[in-house]
């Protein structure tokens, strides 16, 4: 079968149109606050910890066998070359252009790790309609992409390379937290009333009829807390649990939590049910704007939802205050069930980071039962094996575990035969299928949701990026890095893959296509969350601004570069 040039271009563009349309839906969903940042974070955790492991396990077990060991080795080698080549391009960019000192390591990270998860998988799945590749070949290509993704995840999480982003924040000066947050404890004393009365710059909320521009300029600053007119006596009615409500002439009641984290800011806003009632809502970042208050024709007030912005993203992911206060130890693994953990994980009784009174009591009650694990902890400390502990704990991440189990099951013939039909004879279930085939049905059913949800989240992430200010000359840096990432590296990738094919290290067309496509991807969007993790709530957010410019440039021309590379691959390399 021979395709015309126009047909090849259309086939190359069609998957891109689908991908960009899904991303557009995610963009609009985030912009109109249909899915809040909190909900998006929950969905992201679900994808990473439940859906992605199912997809990885299913595709690897179904399409990889011991006969593919050579291809797996080639993929691993090619992945390391791709990562090193991207980092080299980032280093060249730092020497050739003016890159801010506070974004040096961020640019290195952006060059090192490409987006080899949702985008290439979605593209390859779209090509499996029989015109170029069969459905079986497309599934095998997805399995190859899952191995690429596993290698990147292994380096990023198991070896802790995600912490490279934090090197840009070493010189960040944290604002004095005493000037921005009140510290309230359950103890009843007059000192708490004095602290509350000294809150700086208490201002009234913005007028209900003010313009959008005026409202955007009334964001909370790092040294102010927005509240309604409330007397200090309203707070000082008791400091156990919630502050006891008091009654004004209009019958409004107020409540306040006494158990306030040190680094959090609280605001007062009108509730939906009663315009007179006030409630405190917690804000993790102090630069979030107040929800706009309007009135309808009946005179009832209501609040309009805030537009999605970068401050909201930072407020949900930032752990800068916890790191500064020592509540989070980055030399130890973070939570295994979050994409970007907000607390430390632990092994045995090696507690990491923050511990509260209940955890201390629990530890005291179980000391007798954990002597062995305590000895293990002592052994790890004595022989300086924390790096090994970090590596092993991160192997228990669902994303890593799904790939590891999938590779093990796929490379052992009689184990694989328990899941899918192979040449190895094993006893079948009554329906003629392998005994554990129901697990393949389960993982396939759940894994099918991975790519659409991932693309929706990608669009939502891009919607929350903002460019507020840029260092002089960084536009040239971002442009050069974009050209290197999306033009130079794909050209080198085509040459590399053709060399592998000529020496019989790659045997299949889908293997060539998947590898060339992987080398054509933009920077990993996971960097947005890692950067937000280190970003303080207050400040100029220079790292997020630079990262926003970089992603906007890359995704603005991605559809052109990928279409060109795929068209060339189809006509010249695959000769279709």
Swiss-Prot record:
It comes from the Eukaryota. It is found in: Membrane. Residues 30-45, 93-103, 163-400, 459-476, 534-545 are extracellular. The chain crosses the membrane at residues 9-29, 46-66, 72-92, 104-124, 142-162, 401-421, 438-458, 477-497, 513-533, 546-566. It is a multi-pass membrane protein. One of its GO terms (biological process) is transmembrane transport. Residues 1-8, 67-71, 125-141, 422-437, 498-512, 567-576 are cytoplasmic. Its main location: membrane. One of its GO terms (cellular component) is membrane. It holds the Pfam family Mem_trans. The keyword Transport applies. Keywords: Membrane, Transmembrane, Transmembrane helix, Transport. The keyword Transcription does not apply. Belongs to the auxin efflux carrier (TC 2.A.69) family. This is Uncharacterized transporter YLR152C. It comes from Saccharomyces cerevisiae (strain ATCC 204508 / S288c).
